[in-house]
Amino acid sequence: GSICLEPKVVGPCTAYFRRFYYDSETGKCTPFIHGGCEGNGNNFETLRACRAICRA
């Protein structure tokens, strides 16, 4: 899906949520820390969800 091509967005807030995003350069779902606000669709709560949607 097109959301898988969106860049990783940490966002300006300072919360600490462990999430996963699809890295289109490596073709893998990769963990990152999300700040809790803003961002885009390339932000998954689980590795399984990221892999399922982005077929990683």
Curated annotation (Swiss-Prot):
Any idea where the BPTI/Kunitz inhibitor domain is?
4-54
Which residues bear the site annotation Reactive bond for trypsin? 14-15
Subcellular locations according to the entry: Secreted; Nematocyst
GO CC annotations on file: extracellular space; nematocyst
Q: Where is this site: May play a key role in exhibiting antihistamine activity?
A: 17, 34
Keyword field: Disulfide bond, Ion channel impairing toxin, Nematocyst, Protease inhibitor, Secreted, Serine protease inhibitor, Toxin
Instruction: Name the family.
Output: Belongs to the venom Kunitz-type family. Sea anemone type 2 potassium channel toxin subfamily.
Task: Please tell me what else the database record remarks about this protein.
Answer: Negative results: has no activity on Kv1.1/KCNA1, Kv1.2/KCNA2, Kv1.3/KCNA3, Kv1.4/KCNA4, Kv1.5/KCNA5, Kv1.6/KCNA6, Shaker, Kv11.1/KCNH2/ERG1 potassium channels and on TRPV1, the capsaicin receptors.
Name listed for the protein in its UniProt record: PI-stichotoxin-Hcr2p
